[in-house]
Each structure stands twice: as C-alpha cells, then as structure tokens.
Amino acid sequence: MGERQAVKVAILGTGNIGTDLMYKLLRNPGHMELAMFAGIDPQSEGIARAKKLGIPTSYEGIKAVLDDPEIRIVFDATSAKAHVRHAKMLREAGKIAIDLTPAARGPYVVPPVNLGAHLDKDNVNLITCGGQATIPLVFAVSRVVPVRYAEIVSTVASKSAGPGTRQNIDEFTFTTAHGLEAIGGAEQGKAIIILNPAEPPIIMRNTVYVIPANEEFDQAAIVASVDQMVAEVQQYVPGYRLKDAPVFDRRRTPWGERTIIAMLLEVEGAGDFLPPYSGNLDIMTAAAWRVGELFAQHLLGIRQEVAA
C-alpha cells in the first residue's frame, strides 16, 4: 500500500466547536492532516488538550495559520464578526476557508444537497446548526414538489449554547431562513431557535413545516425522498433521525387551505468531545469534517460523487 495522501488543514477557534472538530479529525483524518490548532486565548482548554495530543498549537490566531504556506484548508470556528476579517486574509493567502460561523462570505453548503457545485470556491459557509439539520429535509420535499413556505424551529439544550452561539442568535435566524430558500428551495423561509434550560439537557430537536406550492404531489414520493435524504445525512451524522414519518395535514394558511407537511427531527451528538446532547454543535463539526474531506479529495485529484 502507498503512503496516505493528505492535505494539511488548520482549525481556527479553540472553543467547543473547534475542539470537537479536532477530535473528529484525529478519529478519522481521511485525506486531511491537522497541522495547526490556533486561537487567541492562552488559557484555552482546547489548546491544552491539543498540546497533550501532540498537535501544533498557537494562541496567535490567524497569524499562525497564515505563517504556514503548506496549510491548504482552514476551518474557521471563531465568530461571524471575526470571520469577516479572516475571509479576506485567507483568500489573499490562497487558502480555502470552511466557515462554521454565520458570516456567510462564501456560498452556503449542505453536504448531501449542493457541495459538489462549490468545490472550486475558496470560501464556503456551513450556515448554522439548524440549517444543517433542516435544509436537507426541505430540499427533499422541494425536489418532488415546489415549496411555497418552510418554517423550522430548532430547540437546543441551553448548556450546549456557548457565548459564540448566544452572540450569533440574530445571524442564526436570518442565515437559516435564507438557507431554507437558497438551498432548500422554499419561496419563503423562517427560522426560530429556542434555548431550553431543562435538566438533564435535551438533545437537539427540530420541527420542520413545509407548505407545497400546489396540491399536485405524491405523498409516497415525498416520504421516499425524505427517507433517502435522512440516510445520506446519517453517513456523517449517525445520530440524525426522524422521530416518525412525515405528517400530511390540511390546515388554513395565509395562502388558503393547504396541506402542511410536518417533520420531527432529532440530532444526537457522537460524543467525540462534546456530550451527546450537543447534537446542534455535533452536526456542524460533522458537516465541516465532511466538507473538508471532499475538498481535500478534490485538491488531491481523487474522483468523487457529490451532490451538486
């Protein structure tokens, strides 16, 4: 067997998301080699953990990443405000940015929906945890019948929402709603996030409501499309599951009496670093890993079949 081909990658941001992504890369590096784990807090628990694991670390933030010309892919797990600044510097340095913040300097990507169309970009955005969880389901409906309206409610454990999540609440609602439209295929989207302080903490729960643009659709085809999409997401997020089959219900809406499709979704984390109830964070790091792996394969010239 030949030597494993790998692209050098870096993680920028040493909080919960950055640290969980670090463990995912160590558990399953694929075609990636973690060459730098950088933040700005010398007392960061994440940096301490990385040092013990023998990973190169720095608390000089993006400077440390820019100083290594061999790093090709950078996962930015900082904040929306920070990424606006980082995006320009990474682009000028010729590095690919995978943005885990709601900054959205590059196109939105959801791995099983549209990643293949953006493998030539130098910056892609993973939207939000709610977007990664729910956009696949809206897209699964919209590829069968046009969607007039999609609304999602993401409920996450308060304990799983760190300062970055709390600071980005407004960006979450706007970015997720736009993702429901731009990628999910809905004419109009709306997103709501709820932080639930219950003890013991609950796993991530999402309610997805979809109103088709017309009544001329095959319910069985929609159910089959949704089931296929769930199976695709489960390839990189094993804890992603529907609570039950989609429910079709006639209700009054602003567009008259219509069929509303309701789907209840849970996301349980893999427990790489964060507790299993943090499915909202896990789906972001799992999606980031998947996007990074496919970018690495693309850079290495490895053929792949990816949704476009």
From Swiss-Prot:
Pfam families from the UniProt entry: AcetDehyd-dimer, Semialdhyde_dh
| SMART domains per record | Semialdhyde_dh (SM00859)
Report the EC number(s), separated by commas if there are several.
1.2.1.10
Which principal EC class is assigned to this enzyme? oxidoreductase
Top-level lineage group: Bacteria
- NAD as a keyword of this entry, yes or no, is yes
Cross-referenced Gene3D superfamilies? Dihydrodipicolinate Reductase, domain 2 (3.30.360.10), NAD(P)-binding Rossmann-like Domain (3.40.50.720)
The reaction(s) catalysed by this protein are: acetaldehyde + NAD(+) + CoA = acetyl-CoA + NADH + H(+)
Q: Name one GO biological process term.
A: catabolic process
The UniProt entry, under InterPro entries, shows: Acetaldehyde_dehydrogenase, Acetylaldehyde_DH_C, NAD(P)-bd_dom_sf, Semialdehyde_DH_NAD-bd
NCBIfam families from the UniProt entry: ac_ald_DH_ac, PRK08300.1
HAMAP family recorded? Ac_ald_DH_ac
Q: What is this protein called?
A: Acetaldehyde dehydrogenase
Which source organism does the UniProt entry give?
Thermomicrobium roseum (strain ATCC 27502 / DSM 5159 / P-2)
